[in-house]
Amino acid sequence: MKQYYMQQLETYFDDDGKSTGFKTIFDQLMITGMQALLKDPNSATAKSQFVGYAGALTEYFNGMAGNLEKVQKDINQEIKLKVDQINSLAGEIASLNKQINTIELAGTKANELRDRRTLLIDELSKIVDVEVKETPIIDANNENRETGANRYMVKIAGGQMLVDGSDYNGLECVARTSYEKVNQTDIDGLYEVYWADGQKFNLYNASMGGDLAGLIQMRDGNNGENFTGQVTATGTTTTADGKTHDTVTVKVTKAYLQDLNKCNLSDQGGIIDLGNQEFYYDSWEYTCEYDANGNATYTYTFTLSDSEKNPRGITNDRVGKKAEIGTDLSYQGIPYYMNQMNEWIRTFSQKFNDILTSGYSGSGDPGVKMFTGNKATSSEQFLLDDAAKRYDKQEKKNSKVTVKVNDDSYYRLTAKNFDILDAMEQDPSLMANRKNASDGVEQNDLLNDLKNLATDKSKMSFRGCNASEFLQCILSDVALNASRANTFYASFKDISATIDNQRISISGVDEDEEAVNLVKYQNGYNLASKMIQTLTAIYD
């Protein structure tokens, strides 16, 4: 499973000259387009061309987000198919158990049915890790007598009972609602799996195994970067509708949670686990606070949903408990690659826009932003103009910045909604090219700063690389995961072949051996026939 989907990701991210990828598009913007601008900074044609190249960059990320969403959707559907297969196989195994016991109670061995059941177990073990146990059923009136029937049990994913004799426990896929999303970039309707009795089936069980484990890791893999922290306070707040809601504040220490550009928390609400108790939340806000010594504290405050979703209100005994959203999955799946794109987009857009807005256009007007994002619920775009929300620019002593999930912060930018500011697209002359309004229109000092943004790590750094090396970082991840998947597949194939050969050596048919036996039996038959003919002649 991983092998197939990692090959897809390699194809999507590839930039081999046959397909236009990130490097080609980024070089058009920061080399081809920039060189034309540097030669003629106030040229309407050069600015229009540059904005066009910038638009191609946003469209590239839009397309990549769409491709990865499609892969996640395909994986999600395949998970449902695998769950349906498990149910079908469980039903067949339970039915065979009943038939086998019916026959064997009469003293006859049901070899053919047992072989069929073994094949079903083999098929099930490809989907999920399987444990089988068969025990004889003892006569209730005589503990020394076996009835001839057996109790055949099948457990999956680390000991969870699937089949017990002629009964089986079915599984059901239930789509997450929009307010149950784990990641900001997740598509709607990702499946959770439940037992027929309503108990949740743990999809993230370390003993899952099989195709199902691979699919879950590809769909939900976050490189171990889920939300986690410690509850420091509980309280209440009054929302815009006048209702009072519980709140919980969580201190975070992970670097990827302290930087909002790396944040992948859902912006539509979700489920947070507080000391092994789950609560729905509607929104959150991020706070970065520096004390007098320059020590920073990072917290997230979640506004919990009403009592309809949270019939059990939060209590102060949650303070000090671990808070967690989602699951720590070390594999680099779709959420990981989506978040990598988001981080690069947010960081690059911040740096690029900051340079533009610090200068002036050819007409002497203050520079405007180039990159923004489109709001999902309207035709409007994010403004990204509230300096008070820029935690990356706050004073490093005695300062506090709070960013709410719905603020127009750079957190709102994603690969899916990334776009050019409408005003800039309609009038490229708004693009700044000089640092001082008093300089001549041919001044290009600000453009040089933009040019350096592509290659100077001190201007922008992404995973220790410069802005232009984004694709190398991603492709190295994809290539490594693809290589591991290929190696695992080859090893599994070899082990499977070895097991099949062992089975064949015991239960299979050797054609040469059968041919020798056939000749031997034929010769024996011929000799016996001649002996009978001879004895018959003597008696006659």
Give the ranges of each region predicted by the language model.
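Structural signature of extracellular appendage/secretion-system components
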Residues: M1-D540
